[in-house]
Amino acid sequence: MSPASTAAEAGLIDVRTLAPEIAVDMRYAGPNNFTGRVVPGYLAPRCYLLRPAAEALARVAHALKTAGYRLQVFDCYRPVRAVHAFVAWAADLQDQSTKPQYYPRVDKQALLGDYIAETSGHSRGATVDLGLLDCRHGACHAVEMGTDFDFFDPRAHTDAPDISGVQRAHRQHLLRAMAIEGFANYPMEWWHFTFRPEPTPQTAYDVPVD
């Protein structure tokens, strides 16, 4: 793990300094997430990425803007301490308070491994979770993707068969836009993309998001 103690030392930058049109809805900086509370390590709702990934994401955002769309980010760089908090939450089988919203069809004991990992590519600073906003007709609104972010369910798989044709087309729109700039999708989560090649594939960071 990197000894860096600040985002600047780690080489992490706020993506909105490059693309202010990106909408930020950092779920783990508030209680609107599967743990039901602010996640350790998130002191502010900022999207940090290593510069190569941030610059690539800015290019995606600029291209989508010309077509009337905006990116909406839910998570970007994730401190290691946050990953540990997720693992601890998944191991606490007594806490089922968010099951109806986030994992109604999956047993919580199945989340660890399949959906929540003990290490995360997010901690390496080149992975982002996001969706699309449609701004073509005035006020922006979220593009329907078939599930919400962090919905632990097979329907969140990018190629899930039990979503509508319109929802599938929306997922493919996002997939194509991200792929052009080198982002690879994680097939179990339509929202999850990693910039390739990763700038620091062997290094995780634990600096706070502040």
Predicted regions and their residues:
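Extracytoplasmic cell-surface/polysaccharide-interacting catalytic and binding patches
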Residues: 1-76, 80-188, 197-210
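Conserved metal-phosphate-binding beta-hairpin within the catalytic cores
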Residues: 193
